[in-house]
Amino acid sequence: MKRVTLAIIVFTFVALAAALPAAAQPGAPPCGIAGTWIGQVGDTPLMATYANVVGVVAGTSNLDLYGDPTLGSPYFSAATRNTSGRGVWTRVDRRTYDYMFVAVGLAADNSVLYQLKVWGTKTLGPHCGTMEVTATLDIFAPWQNPLGDEPPAYGSIPGLSGTAKRMPF
């Protein structure tokens, strides 16, 4: 009978420990960025999904951008939409990640007007449910390689920031 009681007690403790969020456990692994996040950077609302590719140290991202495709500039007044952003992220420390993604600004006829390279850092909050974001927006001409060494033909917008919340399970 003692063994059965002991087994029930041990099982109960294991079940309770498994139910606790990882961030609440002492010595727990760092927060992970994988999941879906909703937020805003600057004036642009966004929804982002991050997937782990190399364990929890690097992965891919897919971002839907809901902002003004003209970027507030008369130079891009023909822009009617942006593509989704596609990119990568890598862990810097327990709660901080570097990221970069590329999106394209399109006219009504689907011609490319500009390419965006957005890069910065994401820092997760203490309970892994919020994220502080910094961003620099580089605006490249359609003929440029946004991953190359050439400076962006249309300039950069540094110092953007925002927040996001993790979509709960």
Predicted features and spans:
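Boundary at the C-terminal end of the N-terminal hydrophobic targeting segment
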Residues: 17-26
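Tryptophan-anchored aromatic micro-motifs
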Residues: 29-44, 85-87
